[in-house]
């Protein structure tokens, strides 16, 4: 732990915190600490300077010795020995990770804060055109020590938000100027930060808001504006939904591949005006009459149909990819988690048979949670049916099949046609597994390593061929089809 010496003063005129600091010996090291940006001579000279009192703070100017470029690293876990304008000494302990602020022997500091808060409020009221600027006008409203402390707490919270600013004049040849706000680094680590401080046995707690109210407010805001924004599941940044399609559903903040609906994937891969859907009127008839206590299967199907505008969890058809005729099937995770029922299996099987008869290359985009439990063993049989059709397509007809694994691809889809492609392509960070992490851990009583079911880890194990981002995906597929003798229709 390092010791930092501060000369600090709260200016009465504008309520700003101005400072000078220098680094003294480390508590663990007997030798002097070298500061590459500050010379020892400057430190010695500055320590001998007089400290201006708060009475002439408006006209005083400070020669700031050392600037701070990264305040988070500067006060991540340090103790500061501070001397105020009255030459009273006290210490401040910062621990940003645990969100702790401790003040010792800080009577004069708190009184100076109090005075500064009044000055700050007067200054603000003058700027806002307030009629009253009497520093003692509100003091009598707080007739108990507890009320006054609460008022100080609120003022301190507001003060940290709006006023406490370290203006650091960094000594260098170019005489650069930088400004950093304390609050952004102390309190922005958590949206509901708590700064705990203790002064001679009394506890001073500053809370922006309680965790419960904060989380409930966030939930309300998310629900209210979810039609406008999509939250990234990786960095939790917000993406404007209107622009997502043009950006290929890539997070603007971190580039993470967000879930993409089947219609937009078709627009991404298929040339405009060439898409011809197949069997889009095929719907499930509830073959085993599955009725749950919450909602009957038929009602659930109707609900997803009205919500997504699709009849089932897969869209199949033909089109052109850079002029190359292809047969393509795209699964949609928004329709019952992309689960594979009898209709999904039948549509994919018919697509494969059509591609075999027309000698078309086949492209299947997988996004599924597995077999659909509401259809029992009939959904499991789709795995064998699709695999059988693919065997004829690949082995007997010698045609080219490419499967694309997106997030998530799990269960029966992984165990059947998802892993049968001549070329298996995965999207970055895609979740690919047979059984989910929780199922494995509860069944085998073993911990599944973090990230062991993601595309990058599985790629190292040889589970599929390339990992291709969405931006170059269409070009990569076009090159693969050209390599296998599939050429555009308009090429002589």
Curated annotation (Swiss-Prot):
Binds 1 zinc ion per subunit. InterPro entries: AcCoA_carboxyl_beta, Acetyl_CoA_COase_Trfase_b_su, ClpP/crotonase-like_dom_sf, COA_CT_N. It holds the Pfam family Carboxyl_trans. Zn(2+) binds at residues 232, 235, 251, 254. Its main location: plastid. SUPFAM superfamilies: ClpP/crotonase (SSF52096). Residues 228-492 form the CoA carboxyltransferase N-terminal domain. It is found in: Plastid, Chloroplast stroma. A zinc finger (C4-type) spans 232-254. Keywords: ATP-binding, Chloroplast, Fatty acid biosynthesis, Fatty acid metabolism, Lipid biosynthesis, Lipid metabolism, Metal-binding, Nucleotide-binding, Plastid, Transferase, Zinc, Zinc-finger. Its EC number is 2.1.3.15. GO terms for biological process: fatty acid biosynthetic process; malonyl-CoA biosynthetic process. Pathway: Lipid metabolism; malonyl-CoA biosynthesis; malonyl-CoA from acetyl-CoA: step 1/1. It is an enzyme of class 2 (transferase). It catalyses: N(6)-carboxybiotinyl-L-lysyl-[protein] + acetyl-CoA = N(6)-biotinyl-L-lysyl-[protein] + malonyl-CoA. It comes from the Eukaryota. Its cofactor is Zn(2+). One of its GO terms (molecular function) is ATP binding. Component of the acetyl coenzyme A carboxylase (ACC) complex. Biotin carboxylase (BC) catalyzes the carboxylation of biotin on its carrier protein (BCCP) and then the CO(2) group is transferred by the transcarboxylase to acetyl-CoA to form malonyl-CoA. Acetyl-CoA carboxylase is a heterohexamer composed of biotin carboxyl carrier protein, biotin carboxylase and 2 subunits each of ACCase subunit alpha and ACCase plastid-coded subunit beta (accD). This is Acetyl-coenzyme A carboxylase carboxyl transferase subunit beta, chloroplastic. It comes from Citrus sinensis.
